[in-house]
Amino acid sequence: LVSLCQHRQTKEPYALKKMQKERIVEAQMQDMIVNEKNFLSQMKNPFVLGVCGTCQDRDSVYLVLEFLQGGDLFGLLETKCTLNSTETQFYMGCTIEALAYVHSLNIAFRDLKLENLCLDKNGYCKLVDFGLAKRVLTRTYTVCGSPRYCAPEIVTGRGHCHFVDYWALGVTMYECMFARSPF
């Protein structure tokens, strides 16, 4: 559950991601939550969602995140149907910058899709939702991600590294320009 919150003194808006501990344990998502928190906490890049703080109480874990008021690219495409080549180039340029940064930290994002690219108040595209991200120094064999965006290496279980993010980038770029999946 993500809700809008406001800093008491500065009145600046933030997104508050609340995750119930019971559901985290039931879904065996402890590692995913810890990874997301750790990865976002170390990220300092203008094209990656900023984390402002984390906390927990007896029942829930909270991430205080940068508020991205522009929605996601999926919503933008629902409104506009397609993006022209200039818009697509701009958003994909932001995404490539984000991926290059994430990959420089030996992290594979592994869930690149329209819904995980959100727009800030200035119209820049940012990478969000690091729940499936993983530090990859060699190959990993976990089957994960959204099926429509999965690279063949993931689907076939041959092992993959951060290069799978570029397959998903190609699918995303195609969807921006043609409002449909290439497959």
What are these model-predicted stretches?
Residues 13, 18-44:
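Conserved N-lobe beta3->alphaC-helix segment of eukaryotic protein kinase catalytic domains
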Residues 53-54:
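A short, aromatic-enriched beta-strand patch in the conserved N-lobe beta-sheet
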Residues 59-72:
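Conserved short submotifs of the Hanks-type protein kinase catalytic core
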Residues 74-83:
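AlphaC helix of the protein kinase catalytic domain
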Residues 91-92:
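Activation segment signature within eukaryotic-like protein kinase domains
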Residues 97-107:
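Protein kinase catalytic-loop region centered on the HRD/HxD motif
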